[in-house]
């Protein structure tokens, strides 16, 4: 049986790439925090954002652009914005 090709979307790929860079930047800033307790607190709070980003990226890599893609991106962006509001970094 032929494997179904996943649908690609260049604009969505740019959004995923931008999201990746944002996650990497925040992680780098968290790793630069000297106080271990504060670093753990920030990391714990940011784990949800990383989890949502990983889910978004994996869904796109496996299934391509689909009905759920925009919802996953919105969930990631909401979590990222909430983190930025609650934690100064």
Annotated model-derived regions:
Residues 1-10, 85-89:
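Short intrinsically disordered terminal tails
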Residues 37-73:
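Acidic, low-complexity, intrinsically disordered interaction modules
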């Amino acid at each position: 049986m032929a494997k179904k090709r996943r649908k690609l979307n260049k604009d969505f790929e740019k959004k995923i790439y931008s999201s990746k860079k944002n996650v990497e930047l925040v992680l780098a800033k968290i790793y630069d925090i000297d106080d271990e307790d504060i670093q753990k607190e920030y990391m714990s709070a940011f784990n949800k954002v990383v989890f949502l980003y990983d889910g978004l990226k994996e869904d796109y890599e496996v299934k391509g652009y689909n009905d759920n893609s925009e919802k996953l991106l919105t969930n990631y962006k909401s979590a990222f914005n909430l983190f930025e509001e609650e934690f100064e970094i």
